[in-house]
Amino acid sequence: MAADGQCSLPASWRPVTLTHVEYPAGDLSGHLLAYLSLSPVFVIVGFVTLIIFKRELHTISFLGGLALNEGVNWLIKNVIQEPRPCGGPHTAVGTKYGMPSSHSQFMWFFSVYSFLFLYLRMHQTNNARFLDLLWRHVLSLGLLAVAFLVSYSRVYLLYHTWSQVLYGGIAGGLMAIAWFIFTQEVLTPLFPRIAAWPVSEFFLIRDTSLIPNVLWFEYTVTRAEARNRQRKLGTKLQ
């Protein structure tokens, strides 16, 4: 516990703006949109978790593209220096500039890149063609819907204007297309060599770029290995 003398010391307190979102009191829609605007944080946590457990080079490259996208957003904001709407009613923001919206740029980069990955990178490997296309369509529509709602939330909560989220979305989409092409044409041919590095082998970093459908591959390999071990276990018990 803090000593009594510490409580009287003057201090300048600042919030952690990464997860600090304000909404109008008593506004249910604003409350829900405030949580929705935290989607970039959830995406980053998901990426870190996926990298820790999967350690796949394409996933690491995807996260690197998101980081580069954020750097470009910061650069554009500080070059244009367009203020946020309504004189900046929110004091706890990372920067006073709003053009382009970093939330919008982040989510549209994530959604557009994922869209390209689903339809251009992943290919059919089994006979369930209809179900494969169905889940891709549903997932793609869901990603685009979330990107739109996050962009809308920034306008609704007065963090950005429509033009700021629009240009953020355009910038994020263009960055996603450019990074996807760069990954496919430049980085992917290097992945087998990178995966063979001693440091990559030490950290169990792998390359699955030559596997058309990683989900189906992992499912079949895991099922085959489980059956093989089950047969061995049954033989030992006899």
From Swiss-Prot:
Q: Which family does it belong to?
A: Belongs to the dolichyldiphosphatase family.
Tell me where the signal peptide lies: none
Briefly state the protein's biological role.
Required for efficient N-glycosylation. Necessary for maintaining optimal levels of dolichol-linked oligosaccharides. Hydrolyzes dolichyl pyrophosphate at a very high rate and dolichyl monophosphate at a much lower rate. Does not act on phosphatidate.
GO MF terms listed in the record are:
dolichyldiphosphatase activity
GO process annotations (BP): dolichyl diphosphate biosynthetic process; protein N-linked glycosylation
Q: Which GO terms describe its cellular component?
A: endoplasmic reticulum membrane
Which topology term describes how it sits in the membrane? Multi-pass membrane protein
Swiss-Prot/TrEMBL keywords: Endoplasmic reticulum, Hydrolase, Membrane, Transmembrane, Transmembrane helix
User: Can you name this protein?
Assistant: Dolichyldiphosphatase 1
Give the organism the record lists. Answer: Homo sapiens
From the UniProt record, give the pathway where this protein acts: Protein modification; protein glycosylation
Q: Does the keyword Glycoprotein apply?
A: no
Transmembrane regions listed in the UniProt entry: 33-53, 100-120, 130-150, 162-182
Q: In the Enzyme Commission scheme, what number(s) does this protein have?
A: 3.6.1.43
Q: Which Cys residues form disulphide pairs?
A: none
Please tell me which top-level EC class this enzyme sits in.
hydrolase
Gene3D superfamilies in the record: Phosphatidic acid phosphatase type 2/haloperoxidase (1.20.144.10)
Q: Which CDD domains does the entry link to? A: PAP2_dolichyldiphosphatase
Localisation: Endoplasmic reticulum membrane
The catalysed reaction is:
a di-trans,poly-cis-dolichyl diphosphate + H2O = a di-trans,poly-cis-dolichyl phosphate + phosphate + H(+)
Show the InterPro entries listed in the entry: Dolichyldiphosphatase_PAP2, P_Acid_Pase_2/haloperoxi_sf, P_Acid_Pase_2/haloperoxidase
